[in-house]
């Protein structure tokens, strides 16, 4: 694994520069290090180059102005990363909120997208805009709920939620938190998360689907079997040519819960588009 800064983002990378590129964008609050199990598998089994940035305001990447957290603006940030790294086209893999960014990237930069792989994301609806201040207040309440008395309490909660625990998972999940006032709290502040939620509401996913469909881009949606049925059906209706697969007994964080299944499904899908 290599790490570096490019286009004002902190980036984790696995694989060789000359191999077909994959950009992984993690979920809300997460970092590129969340790909530390699937990244090596995509390299070893499918010969891919995996780049996984910390989104602005996450991990080791600095926050930006509130308007910069709209998904279309974050897609532009990903395009800037491509340009700085000399990557012309890549498969965009988005987990959870990262799926929103992935969809907007594909809608705006069709010529730079070889495939779109969405993992438990890119298919959820959006609430009506509440205004930035209200969105930040909501995020502050959620952040307090996600704050723990210490690392042991945080790791125990994560291990129980994910139903598995490894040194790689501990490393990845530690990277999203920091010590704050004697407790362990998310690195992503309420201001960052509130701006993201407001941006998602101002730019609903449905607005990006027509451009993706018109471009004929190959699309994969991998969901937990218990994922919202209505959301999946709306996604199928909007993008009828998309490939949709479900993971039995899965949870929302499929990247942590079933890394081998995610890497195998995404890797095969990306390889088919070469």
Name each region found by the language model.
Residues 94, 98, 102:
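Gly/Ala-rich beta-loop-alpha elbow adjacent to hydrolase catalytic centers
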Residues 250-259:
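Catalytic histidine-centered segment of alpha/beta-hydrolase-like enzymes
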């Amino acid at each position: 694994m290599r790490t570096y800064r490019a286009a004002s983002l902190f980036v984790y990378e696995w694989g060789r520069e000359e191999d077909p590129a994959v950009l992984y964008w993690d979920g809300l609050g997460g970092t590129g290090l969340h790909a530390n199990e699937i990244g090596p598998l995509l390299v070893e089994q499918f010969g891919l180059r995996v780049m996984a940035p910390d989104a602005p305001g996450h991990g080791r990447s600095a926050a930006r102005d509130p308007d910069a957290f709209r998904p279309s603006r974050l897609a532009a940030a990903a395009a800037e990363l491509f340009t700085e790294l000399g990557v012309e086209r890549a498969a965009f893999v988005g987990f959870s909120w990262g799926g929103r960014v992935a969809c907007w990237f594909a809608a705006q930069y069709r010529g730079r997208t070889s495939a779109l792989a969405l993992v438990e994301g890119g298919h959820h609806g959006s609430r009506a805009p509440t205004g930035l201040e209200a969105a930040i207040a909501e995020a502050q309440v959620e952040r307090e709920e996600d704050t723990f008395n210490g690392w042991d309490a945080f790791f125990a909660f994560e291990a129980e939620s994910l139903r598995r625990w490894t040194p790689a998972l501990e490393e990845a999940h530690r990277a999203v938190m920091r010590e704050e006032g004697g407790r362990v709290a998310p690195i992503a502040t309420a201001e960052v998360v509130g701006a993201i939620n407001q941006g998602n509401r101002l730019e609903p996913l449905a607005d990006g689907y027509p451009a993706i469909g018109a471009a004929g881009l190959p699309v994969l949606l991998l969901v937990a079997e218990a994922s919202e049925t209505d959301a999946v059906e709306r996604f199928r209706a909007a993008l009828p040519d998309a490939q949709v697969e479900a993971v039995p007994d899965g949870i929302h964080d499929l990247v942590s819960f079933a890394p081998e299944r995610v890497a195998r499904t995404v890797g095969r899908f990306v390889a088919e588009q070469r």
